[in-house]
Structure formats: C-alpha cells, structure tokens
Amino acid sequence: MEVILLEKVANLGNLGDKVKVRAGYGRNFLVPYGKAVPATKANVEQFEARRAELEKSAAEKLSAAQARAEAINGKEVTIVAKSGDEGKLFGSVGTKDIADAVTALGVEVEKSEVRLPEGALRNTGEYEVDVQMHTDVTATVKVIVVGE
C-alpha cells in the first residue's frame, strides 16, 4: 500500500514523502491517526494543493515542541513514594507520575511523551528520563525518587 505522509513519522519518512507500507499499518494506524493518506491520484493532487499549509503547521508544531523542551530540559522533579528499608518501592513510579510532576513545573506533558525504556522506576534514587515532545525534539529531566 502506498501512502503520502502528512507529518514526519519516525523510521518512515518526512512530510510529503510517498512511501510503501504494509496494508495493515497504513489502514489501522497511519490513516486513522491522520498521519497519512492513501496515494490515489485525487489525494496526490489535494496534497500538493495543501502542501504549504501542512508544512507551516508542521513547523509551528516543531517550534512549540522546542519551546516546551527548553523550558524543562535539565530540570529536576522529586517524587515521593512509599518504600521499604532497602530503597525498594511499594509499587512503582510510572510515566503518569512523571508527567504529572513535570506538568506541576508549568509545562504541559502527556504521559505518552515520557520515555522509560527499562519500564517503571521501582527503586529510590536519581534517574535521567527522556521526554519526547516531537519526533525531532527530546528533553531530559532528572527524576529523584524519595522514599516515604
């Protein structure tokens, strides 16, 4: 299935690229989420007519993401959680907890933007956590988990 990308998609291409993807990926993810349209003649013509508008909105999203990233990059957030004697938490600190703590700093962050490659934090200590605001923009936040 060939699609035209309406925004930059990681590991696939940039705005306006015509790429060949598996039918299920195109039908079930790219098209419903507004990231692409099927590459029919009508859609190609319509895309070329709207290209400048789409590029402008993509540039605005990128600059907004960069501004948000600069506001939180290098900041520290402290999260208090119940823990045992050896620093092991009862439960864990997940993406929602980190997103809420960063949002309390004054920058709106969704839990889907927080990247925890090793999974939820289960011990007390200091962690470097990436917050991916945009495909090209990532900020690093220092998360300090303190036992209660």
Swiss-Prot record:
GO CC terms = ribonucleoprotein complex; ribosome
Task: Spell out the Gene3D superfamilies in the cross-references.
Answer: Ribosomal protein L9, C-terminal domain, Ribosomal protein L9, N-terminal domain
What keywords tag this UniProt record? Ribonucleoprotein, Ribosomal protein, RNA-binding, rRNA-binding
One of the record's GO molecular function terms: structural constituent of ribosome
Q: What InterPro entries has UniProt attached to this entry? A: Ribosomal_bL9, Ribosomal_bL9/RNase_H1_N, Ribosomal_bL9_bac/chp, Ribosomal_bL9_C, Ribosomal_bL9_C_sf, Ribosomal_bL9_N, Ribosomal_bL9_N_sf
Entry keyword annotation includes tRNA processing = no
Q: Does the record carry rRNA-binding as a key word?
A: yes
> Which biological process, per GO, is one annotated for this protein?
translation
**Record-linked NCBIfam families:** L9
Listed PANTHER family:
50S RIBOSOMAL PROTEIN L9
User: What family is reported?
Assistant: Belongs to the bacterial ribosomal protein bL9 family.
Record's function text: Binds to the 23S rRNA.
The name under which this protein is listed is: Large ribosomal subunit protein bL9
Organism name: Hahella chejuensis (strain KCTC 2396)
